[in-house]
């Protein structure tokens, strides 16, 4: 399974790259707003850093606007993937952009049927939002399981990119289900490396090491 980092913070991207845990990047307007920077400046910098897929989201909601923004952002680098919302207008844009050779990530997916439509339209990635479904007392990972099964049934090439990841269990369940990608906030990447028994074991090893006679200098 590939790990994308879900951020527009260049500092976080650099840290994830240093760990070897950044196969790609996903951004959205909310993440860009947190940086206080212009989106195009952020995108240009990320393109220089990351060789893998970089999702750049359009803000237009109409077909022509999505095409205009998508074509513009696609010029920033061959690794740029255009992110469009799962709406009727968005699906039209997916079909056109895909036919033009542009990779597309369909975002804000909340049902397996929506994911089926995205795959039929030719999406490169589908982004089911598991955390937001959990927030309304539905089962986000059950949605992912259904999407993975449907795609396998019919041999769709669209990759399942699990999004709205809130904690390590989401990552674990995505991996068990066979999702292609999980896009993960840097804070969750750090949590993945932690376990209380690891900390306790390290503490004990170091304490025991202090008891070992040391050679005289």
Swiss-Prot record:
It comes from the Bacteria. Pfam families: TAL_FSA. CDD domains: Transaldolase_FSA. HAMAP family: Transaldolase_3b. It is found in: Cytoplasm. GO terms for cellular component: cytoplasm. Transaldolase is important for the balance of metabolites in the pentose-phosphate pathway. Gene3D superfamilies: Aldolase class I. It comes from Anaeromyxobacter dehalogenans (strain 2CP-C). PANTHER family: FRUCTOSE-6-PHOSPHATE ALDOLASE 1-RELATED, TRANSALDOLASE. The lineage of its organism: Bacteria, Pseudomonadati, Myxococcota, Myxococcia, Myxococcales. Signal peptide: none annotated. The keyword Cytoplasm applies. This is Probable transaldolase.
């Amino acid at each position: 399974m590939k790990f994308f980092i879900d951020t527009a913070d260049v500092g976080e991207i650099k840290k994830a790259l240093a760990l070897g845990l950044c196969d790609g990047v996903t951004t959205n307007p909310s993440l860009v707003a947190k940086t206080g920077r212009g989106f195009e400046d952020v995108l240009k910098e990320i393109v220089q850093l990351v060789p893998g897929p970089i999702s750049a989201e359009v803000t237009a909601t109409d077909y022509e606007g999505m095409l205009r923004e998508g074509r513009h952002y696609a010029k920033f680098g061959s690794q740029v993937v255009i992110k469009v919302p799962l709406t009727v207008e968005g699906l039209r844009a997916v079909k056109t952009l895909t036919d033009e050779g542009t990779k597309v990530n369909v975002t804000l997916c909340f049902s397996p049927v929506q994911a089926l439509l995205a795959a039929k339209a030719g999406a490169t990635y589908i982004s089911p939002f598991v955390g937001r479904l959990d927030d309304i007392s539905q089962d986000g990972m059950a949605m992912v399981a259904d999407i993975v099964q449907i795609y396998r049934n019919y041999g769709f090439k669209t990759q399942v990119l699990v999004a709205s990841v809130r904690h390590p269990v989401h990552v674990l369940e995505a991996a068990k289900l066979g999702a292609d990608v999980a896009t993960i906030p840097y804070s969750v990447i750090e949590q993945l490396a932690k376990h209380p028994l690891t900390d306790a074991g390290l503490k004990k090893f170091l304490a025991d090491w202090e008891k070992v006679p040391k050679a005289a200098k």
